Amino acid sequence: MSEIEKKLATLSNGPGVYLMKDESGEIIYVGKARSLKKRVSSYFLEKPNRDLKTGILVKKIASFDAILVTTEKEALILEANLIRKHKPRYNILLKDGKRFPSLRIDVRTSYPRLEVVRKVKKDGAIYFGPFSSAGKLRSTLKIINKTFQLRKCKQKEPPKRNRPCLNYQMGQCLGPCCLPVDRDEYLDMVNEVILFLKGRTNDLLQKIKEQMAAASERQEYELAARLRDRMFAIQATVEKQAAVTTDFVDRDVIGIDREPEGSAISVLYIRGGFLLGSRNYNFDEVLGTDSESIQAFLRQYYDKDRFIPDEVFVPCQLENMELMEQWLTETAEKRVVLHWPQRGEKTRLIEMANENAHEALKDRISSENVFKSLLERLQKRLRMDRPPRRIECFDISHTGGNQTVASMIVFEDGKEAKSEYRTFNIDSLDHPDDYAAMHEVMARRFSPDKDWPTPDVLLIDGGKGQLSITASVLDGLGVMGAFEVISIAKKDEAKKETMDKIYRPGQANPVVFGRDGDVLLFLQRVRDEAHRFAITTHRKKRAKTIRKSALDSVPGIGEKRKKALLRHFGSIKRLKEASPEDIAQVPGISVKRAQEILEALDA
């Protein structure tokens, strides 16, 4: 009897969690079961209709562990915690990507305002969203700003001002910061905004009509005209929208599609009967049925800081439907309905979500095939043993040699891997020296104490000189030859060159790409991304320096002049070395003020 058979014989029939391991002892799958014995044993029984990926997984299982718990709810929670901890290859794993924005309004403040947030908190405020694109969010805010006159200032309560801001002059704010604005009237307008964002436009239009009629009876014709304009603006907006349901319920609709190459899950955001947007999630190798995949997805997707609507539609019957509904209700701290529609108009929503997932998966597979071909041709041009999976690119950015920052960006399988991006602050230089900066960066990147993945290709932004210094440093570190090192130099238009050039160490002539021009374009894209990231990081560092500099102690120098001085001289050190006449060249600075600046800096 094998070790697995011995373990199967001792398994309990109670609920629990099981961890499948490969020959190296790595956990490759975590699952939960109502009956551990039945579920785990099913993996090792021959089944003619077995899922393809299940068959692949079973061949890789060398051992397993099982954890017995008291209830199915405990198993559900433990499974999610173990998946989060071990990140098994064959489980659904949601990456911590940037969340879609939502709108937040806190009606407990004196004069509530709308703000854009990416985290939904249980703080008593009202949230609307998520908005699947910044464009849709901006369009919604534009309509609200034109139609309603909510304040825009960022403080929790309106700041005290002597005169109203530009928004008041444009008719887009009532000016509660300095004008006597009736709070009850303002809150009426806030409630109208809430009705608008909930999609209850019929109720809103009826309310505005009643207010308009009442204002006319009181002979408040200016107010009646404003209400009329607001009503027309809302009607024009509603005409452009198409409702997907006849009720006003907020719901998320989940769809799924699976192929041998991977799977995709799509979420449709329906708010107040209108489709607000959608988001697709792609996964590589995933084990289990649609039910298991959807259940694992829900546990991670709604785990924290996420708006949970009143209803969640799923495309199939889940094994633990009641348990999942209970968990959603407890997490949301309100009643949440988990439903599998099987008839009527609601099944059309599931079809839409499934089709969305299908298109997302099809696009992803097509994209992967394109990148696979591209990387295979790059392998051929660089004469490598295998296609490069991980490409790292470095770039240097500075202001006259000061505040030098080096960026490292990573592409994996042809796509940006932003979680792998790194920055290096080069504080040892106070003058322009890209070679010295690159020397320090390479020494730090490939230092023995850095337990980072080894790249297949290291791409340097620069010509033969940059490549030579990089190769020299790598050779000194003992890593030269462990991966391919190349540099990308811009075309020399004076020599009538038509494309950028790729150089390899020890070769005078650039690599010839011939018909593989798209491979060169890909490397240019990698270089441009490194350049973008370096500049963005450098700007942040420079802004931080501007905020906290020796100039803060100089009387009469505000933020605007401080920026102008640092932009002109590049650093405090160079400013100190300048003459009063040189400093007076900066707009807004007189010779007398320049002398005061130098005296303050020397103090």
Curated annotation (Swiss-Prot):
It is found in: Cytoplasm. It comes from the Bacteria. Keywords: Cytoplasm, DNA damage, DNA excision, DNA repair, Excision nuclease, SOS response. Its main location: cytoplasm. One of its GO terms (cellular component) is excinuclease repair complex. Transmembrane segments: none annotated. Residues 13-92 form the GIY-YIG domain. Residues 202-237 form the UVR domain. GO terms for biological process: nucleotide-excision repair; SOS response. GO terms for molecular function: DNA binding; excinuclease ABC activity. Interacts with UvrB in an incision complex. The UvrABC repair system catalyzes the recognition and processing of DNA lesions. UvrC both incises the 5' and 3' sides of the lesion. The N-terminal half is responsible for the 3' incision and the C-terminal half is responsible for the 5' incision. Belongs to the UvrC family. PANTHER family: UVRABC SYSTEM PROTEIN C, UVRC/OXIDOREDUCTASE. This is UvrABC system protein C. It comes from Desulfatibacillum aliphaticivorans.
